[in-house]
Amino acid sequence: MIFDMSNRLGAGAVVFTLAVLIGCQAKAEATSAAADISVEEAEPATLGSMDEQYAWVGDLGDRDALPGKPLYIEHCAGCHEAQVYKAPHTTWLELMSPQVLYRSITEGIMQSQAAHLSGGDKQHIVEYITQMRLGDPDAGPAVAWCEGSASEFSTLDENHLTGWGHDTRRYVSSDAAGFDRSQIDNLELKWSFGFPASTRARSQPTIAMGAVFVGSQDGTVYAFDLETGCVRWTFAARAEVRTGITLGKRGPEGIPTAYFGDIIANVYALDAKTGELVWHTSPDDHHSATLTGTPAFANGNLYVPVSSLEVVTAANPEYACCTFRGHVMAVNGDDGSVLWDSYAIPNTPISTGDTAAGTKIFAPSGAPVWTSPTIDVDRNLLIFGTGENYSSPADQNSDAVIAVRLDTGERLWSRQTFPDDAWNVACMMVDNPNCPEEDGPDYDQASSPLLVDIGAGKSVVVAGQKDGRVFALDWETGQNKLWEVKLGRGSIQGGVHFGMAADGTTVYVPINDMNDTRNGEWLDPETARPGVSAVNAVTGEVLWTHVQENVCGEGRPFCDPGVSAAITATDGAVIAGHLDGIIRIYDRNSGEIIWSYNTTTPVTGTNGVIARGGGISGSGPALGAGHMVINSGYGLYNHEAGNALLVFAPKATGSVSAR
């Protein structure tokens, strides 16, 4: 049975809110300079236990009372609560949909381990882990299938492949977009799709071959007809697909292929015309490894950034923290074979002592690679950013920009931009011995570094960080910081997230500047600067800043005006999805808002499921063939849930021909 999202997400309905990493206190937020609440009135909170991270309000009640608990402890916890390679930690299992988990233990990778369990026991275990009812496990995705010409793909035009996977600058020319600045005023919703039984929609859509390719929370990857929203094919991945879908040509025949990753660190290659699996591999056997950044494609190869949620697992004081190291792996696009692997931390973590609780400490660890790498084929260069260390002592590879050779993965240079940053979720709790002595501040390089041409044959690497700073580095050495500007206050959820954009020598910077850091601290609302800024990449001059006022209103405790999603630039405009669920398009020269749309307005999708957006985070707008496509809904990290894929086109153009 497909869950009815009109009941799940409609007005007055019960909404699931998963608060991973940041706690689950449902308090009113002061999130802009216009907020009413003062610092003195705020009541910041820390996490009291790991259970608070997964406080659901919805399908099932008291988790401890569910019949699946003793079954899980007896049959599953021995691997999934321990540091067992290839066994995803419970942290990840709780993020999956019940359908995906049930499929895994009945016909997937865990089939043999669960063979002795009855069907009822399997259902109880799945519902205990996810706190969601399974429904009909045999029901396929609720879709309207394409017929006739709507099911036909056009030729893959590599010249119009833009954004993550191909160009981290996220600039789309008017020619590639299929509409220009003069038509933005006429953008209107053309069709929508409601992802069934979903509280988040965070896979970067890709427009190509007359289709929209996108992943989803339940692991289904869709190929939609761009014109009508009917579905050409679907593919069931092993877990949620939050990366973008990268298109490329495979083999000497140039077969169009779709590449992507799921949240338990599987990489897939599909025939883009049929959805059939070509190959599958896993770039990391660590139990907490994940793929959050979109793989990049160049020279027939795929470059996969690898991150993890061991930062969450470490909140258990009995967990020996930590052993994961972030890295980028190059694989052959034809068969998935490994070409090279470049670790942010070159050496395997070693034991460095014990915590106050007597638990082993392993270090250095962490430095996850959250976002898509930047590639310059002509310079034989790949650049990526890293996050914080997970354990003490911190090393020089966390919060860093790293450059390697594209052909071998050999390190060329590394520039740490914030030193001594070791942090994990234990630091959000009182007296948790697994918190590193550095205690943060968790200032990741959370956005893809941009390689920007500044004229006269020169280029700079522009990097943005969660402390709110943006700066330019020499691309050849990583040294000689050419300029630096601070655009936000910075915090665990502050500063620059996911993706900046660049149009020529202008860099557009999204800022998420939440007052409630969800780390036991409130920041002064009078100093908040959530929104978008434009910066001259040559000089660092701030050309304009639009600070977004809080329009959330009462009754929306997880609403915020900041920009946590990647933004997209096109000729004359820059497009940003905000955490308040509103898409805003800014004039490139002035920063004036020239168009907006509230994605939280419920609409009926092409599959008959109500599509209602929420906080927009992670992925950004995709432009192509006369359309703009965006996902909305991010029921994680104290942001608003949603399940909407929304497709817009200029109404004056009528039916737009898809390339």
Where are these regions (language model features)?
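Beta-propeller blade signature
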Residues: F324-G336, N397-E410, A528-G540, N643-G654
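The canonical Cys-X-X-Cys-His
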Residues: G68-Q83, L101, I125, I129
